[in-house]
Amino acid sequence: MVNYPHKLKAKSSINRPVPGIVNFANRGMSFEKMINESNSYYLSRGLAVIHKKPTPIQIVKVDYPHRSRAKIVEAYFRQASTTDYSGVYKGHYIDFEAKETRQKKSMPMKNFHSHQIEHMEAVLEQKGICFVLLHFSSLRETYLLPASYLIEFYKIDKGGKSMPLTYIQEHGYPIEMQQLPSIPYLEIIEQKLLGGIINE
């Protein structure tokens, strides 16, 4: 069982199906898997080096039901997580979070936490490229929203209200899902945030 720093225990997900997994183009691929696949594609083509950040966990208790098998039964998050992904593209530091919802009209802001917002602000302070990838699974729509607009909306009431899809459409950029890369977000960064054309 994994516990958060404030000692609240997270529900165990061992041997339970993960809810909310969405099929894309009948391939049974989750949003996170599509992002990871896209990052692998960019890396293999020498376009960018972007990886999912590991979550630092402190193991507290391990059971050994068999001599050759160990089972972690209790652990704690060492620190609060920041964002999901980071890396470098053409000398620019890239940092982003990915969120998914089945709602059709808004993105729940409860999915974002104050320490993540503070981290994004710090990245922007250092002139890094920071954003969120927002996926509406019921609509099969994905958007890249610059972190500055997420931060602005979050500060209205500390993330108490959901972000309307209309706000995301007004300030963000739609991403058309495709074969490879599945989520071509680098094209948006290049064309909208850097003003150039990506060379593949």
Swiss-Prot record:
GO molecular function, one term: endonuclease activity
Subcellular location: Cytoplasm
Cross-referenced SUPFAM superfamilies: Restriction endonuclease-like
Enzyme Commission code: 3.1.21.10
Keyword Magnesium included in the entry's annotation: yes
Needed co-factor(s): Mg(2+)
Keyword Glycosyltransferase: no
Enzyme class: hydrolase
Main location: cytoplasm
Pfam family, one: RecU
A Gene Ontology term for the protein's cellular component: cytoplasm
Cofactor binding note: Binds 1 Mg(2+) ion per subunit.
Catalytic activities: Endonucleolytic cleavage at a junction such as a reciprocal single-stranded crossover between two homologous DNA duplexes (Holliday junction)
Biological process according to GO: chromosome segregation; DNA recombination; DNA repair
Keyword field: Cytoplasm, DNA damage, DNA recombination, DNA repair, Endonuclease, Hydrolase, Magnesium, Metal-binding, Nuclease
Binding residue positions for Mg(2+): T82, D84, E97, Q116
Site residues by UniProt (Transition state stabilizer): K99
Family in the record: Belongs to the RecU family.
Function: Endonuclease that resolves Holliday junction intermediates in genetic recombination. Cleaves mobile four-strand junctions by introducing symmetrical nicks in paired strands. Promotes annealing of linear ssDNA with homologous dsDNA. Required for DNA repair, homologous recombination and chromosome segregation.
Protein's UniProt name: Holliday junction resolvase RecU
Organism encoding this protein: Streptococcus sanguinis (strain SK36)
Organismal lineage: Bacteria, Bacillati, Bacillota, Bacilli, Lactobacillales
